[in-house]
Amino acid sequence: MITIKKGLDLPINGKPEQVIRDGNAVTEVALLGEEYVGMRPSMKIHEGDTVKKGQILFEDKKNPGVVFTAPVSGTVTAINRGAKRVLQSVVIRVEGNDQETFAKYSPAELVSLSSEQVRQNLQTSGLWTALRTRPLSKIPAVDAVPSSIFVNAMDTNPLCADPAVIINEYQADFTNGLTVLTRLHNKVNLCKAAGSNIASVDNVDSHEFAGVHPAGLVGTHIHFIDPVGINKSVWHINYQDVIAIGKLFTTGELFTDRVVALAGPQVKNPRLVRTNIGANLSQLTANELADGNNRVISGSVLYGAKAEGAHDYLGRYALQVSVIAEDTEKEFFGWISPQANKYSITRTVLGHFGRKLFNFTTAENGGHRAMVPIGSYERVMPLDILPTLLLRDLEVGDTDSAQALGALELDEEDLALCTFVCPGKADYGSFLRQALDKIEKEG
């Protein structure tokens, strides 16, 4: 077992009840194009087309063979594009139950599948997009081979769902999905919380992690088990997509249900809800939120995406919907007050003392300023890197030094705590993505 001591469990109010219930019915779902790093779509449909569940919507021009399929059947009502015609979202109005079918096998046949059979079924169904690489966090090429595959069956994000609750509901499908992954590659790592009753299968290496966030992030697991570099990559996948793989191979149908934690200080009844990948979040959260101006976030409060307009949908990789209040009011002499209801990792406010939960908002509690190295980053960074030096290089754009300091091991989520505790209010996730894009392009 690996215990993580450096990090932070955010003391935020609104933790979800760990019981799965059906969420509000949604009439719209969407695929969000900007979630897929470096993807350039070749559209296969147009607005007004009727599509089946599992039908190809677009293909990646840069990665031929990687297709993105419809999560529901219905009518394409909008193809939203942003600056430079970047694909923002493909919106589908839910209608009917028509769906494409794919190869299916009995559970006993799964252990004898070839790697080619697994690749073919994942790629034609669109479930290949559930896999992502480290470094770069991109969808792997159809013929790529990783050093290993990581299955993340734990979560330590603020307000997260307990993966064991969801896996227990789909235990057979999860087991079948793991078996399929062992046929894709002979080195599969299952990472779970210490003491978890999540069962493994033959030919899968189980690893237990304990401690504070980011103990549940796949970047932490990769760092301690099979570190990556410029010439070495691994793939990773979350536990709900493993369930979907198990369903696909035993039923021949695409499974796009998603159980998410609907939680946060502004949620009336925080709980786990069953919905669909790409669900419209305005519809999913209707009558669920406290009065006032709220920010709905697809994903974690630490690094999720604001859900509004063309992006008002549940992300492909999001396992939670977080809601906090929009804070637009300025506090008079806020810096000089005792601030008993505010939290700070630096212990400079009264709110730090005592084990209480806080109603966090969108307030940054300060303006953007120069980087201030006072040891905050080191307190929340458990990986064997020098965070202050790395973050400095990312902020100034020195990719050579950042690469030498371990930037290739990281994703935006791995630096979310550094952003949270930063006295200078810098967004290190965006700096990291700019650096990774430059490293990929220029080396």
From Swiss-Prot:
| Species lineage | Bacteria, Pseudomonadati, Pseudomonadota, Gammaproteobacteria, Pasteurellales
- Its EC number is 7.2.1.1
- Residue spans making up a coiled coil are none
What is an example of a GO molecular function annotated in this UniProt entry? oxidoreductase activity, acting on NAD(P)H, quinone or similar compound as acceptor
Please give the name of this protein. Answer: Na(+)-translocating NADH-quinone reductase subunit A
Q: Where are the transmembrane segments?
A: none
First-level EC class: translocase
According to the record's subunit comment, the protein's assembly and interactions are: Composed of six subunits; NqrA, NqrB, NqrC, NqrD, NqrE and NqrF.
The chemistry this enzyme catalyses reads: a ubiquinone + n Na(+)(in) + NADH + H(+) = a ubiquinol + n Na(+)(out) + NAD(+)
